[in-house]
UniProtKB/Swiss-Prot annotation:
Name of this chain's protein: Truncated tyrosine phosphatase D1
Signal peptide: none
Ranges where the Tyrosine-protein phosphatase domain occurs: 1-140
Family: Belongs to the protein-tyrosine phosphatase family.
Gene: D1
GO molecular function: protein tyrosine phosphatase activity
């Protein structure tokens, strides 16, 4: 049964993880086998599809009743921006969830800041369809 406060609980736990591992987040977390998982170390709690033939910087996670529903990765930088959008296009991704804090100094912008504004990355044209802001998070 879904609890009505599950989103708040996920956000609380995410904040707690970041606070507890402040300087070591994405750097020191290891798997049970003590092997690094690259930029996805913080997703150890999610069941991954390890047999997939994708780049190691991406991790596919199943949804409730849909296989490979979510594509998880770190925020792209200038060098990995095209690879990020290529993978999103290849996997037919329409929803992107960014767990890192949003501020005006994002490492590298990879989508439009305003609705209906177009962001271009080589042959890809990315349009922000909608945006909404709540107390704990921003939905774009």
């Amino acid at each position: 049964m879904r609890r009505p406060n599950c989103i708040a609980e996920i956000l609380r736990q995410h904040t707690q993880i970041i606070e507890e591992s402040n300087n070591y987040y994405y750097l020191k977390m290891k798997t049970k086998d003590n092997k690094s998982q690259g930029p996805l170390r913080s997703l150890l709690c999610l069941p991954k599809n390890v047999n997939q033939k994708t780049d190691s910087a991406f991790c596919s996670v199943d949804g409730y009743n849909v296989k490979n529903k979510f594509l998880c990765t770190r925020s792209p930088n200038q060098d990995s921006l095209y690879q990020f959008w290529s993978m999103a296009y290849k996997k037919n991704i329409h929803i992107i969830v960014m767990l890192s804090p949003i501020d005006n100094l994002m490492r590298h912008r990879y989508w439009s800041l305003e609705e209906d504004e177009v962001f271009e990355c080589r042959e890809f044209r990315i349009r922000l369809r909608s945006s909404a802001q709540w107390i704990q998070f921003l939905k774009k």
